[in-house]
């Protein structure tokens, strides 16, 4: 009796696991479809960059003065690009923050030329810019979706920018597929963990 109840419990757990895996796979397999409907963008936090913040006196025109991708971060960005290809995203309009770790992440995705836009630049060191930067990002998103409605749009930025825009905290290399309303603001989202 105890063995039979244990088997039934195990069968139920396994059935729920299979259903969950199928639903997750279906959600991932359909990534290319929403990204070409003129309503979605894929925001990505730059890949792994060891350390915290940028060194004092860093300059955007000198990567050597910034916190940059480590070897793991470079591989993480490449694996993310391969994963996107498996989801049907072979090319995209790719936008990046001016910070080198973001530009390098965007470049290593290998989805097309990288368009550097200050709207995606970090305000971590000056939080008083949060509203201004978030509004700039909203305008960039709205303009890009109007300009490229049938082209996947990928934007590589920083955790503070993405959190301010979506309300979601992402880890290094994580992505968030965001459905955008007519006003350029997020309606819904789905998070995709970074490649490990």
Q: Which role does the model predict for each range below?
A:
Residues 25-29:
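Sec/Tat signal peptide C-region and signal peptidase I cleavage site
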Residues 96-99, 156-160:
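Short, well-ordered beta-to-alpha junction loops that form the rim of enzyme active sites
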Residues 2-14:
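Bacterial N-terminal signal peptides that target proteins for export
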Residues 136-146:
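A short, acidic, amphipathic alpha-helical segment used as a generic capping/interface helix at domain edges
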Residues 13-24:
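Bacterial N-terminal signal peptides
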Residues 39-41, 151-157:
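Generic beta-sheet signal
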Residues 30-118, 123-127, 132, 168-196:
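Active-site-proximal alpha-helix that buttresses catalytic centers in soluble enzyme cores
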Residues 87-89, 144-150:
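Glycine-rich phosphate-binding loop signature in dinucleotide/nucleotide-binding domains
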């Amino acid at each position: 009796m105890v063995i039979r109840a244990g088997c039934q419990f195990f069968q139920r757990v396994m059935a729920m696991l299979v259903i969950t895996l199928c639903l997750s796979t279906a959600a991932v397999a359909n990534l290319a479809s929403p990204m070409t409907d003129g309503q979605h963008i894929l925001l990505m936090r730059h890949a792994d960059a060891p350390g915290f913040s940028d060194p004092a006196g860093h300059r955007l025109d000198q990567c050597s003065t910034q916190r940059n991708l480590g070897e793991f971060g470079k591989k993480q960005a490449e694996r993310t690009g391969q994963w996107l290809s498996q989801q049907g995203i072979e090319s995209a309009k790719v936008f990046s923050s001016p910070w080198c770790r973001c530009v390098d992440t965007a470049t290593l995705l290998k989805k097309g030329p990288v368009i550097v836009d200050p709207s995606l630049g970090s305000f971590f060191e000056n939080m008083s810019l949060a509203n201004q930067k978030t509004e700039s990002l909203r305008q960039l998103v709205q303009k890009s979706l109007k300009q490229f409605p049938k082209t996947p749009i990928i934007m590589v930025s920083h955790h503070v920018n993405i959190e301010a825009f979506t309300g979601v905290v992402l880890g290094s290399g994580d992505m968030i597929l965001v459905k955008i309303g007519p006003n350029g603001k997020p309606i819904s989202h789905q998070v995709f963990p970074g490649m490990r």
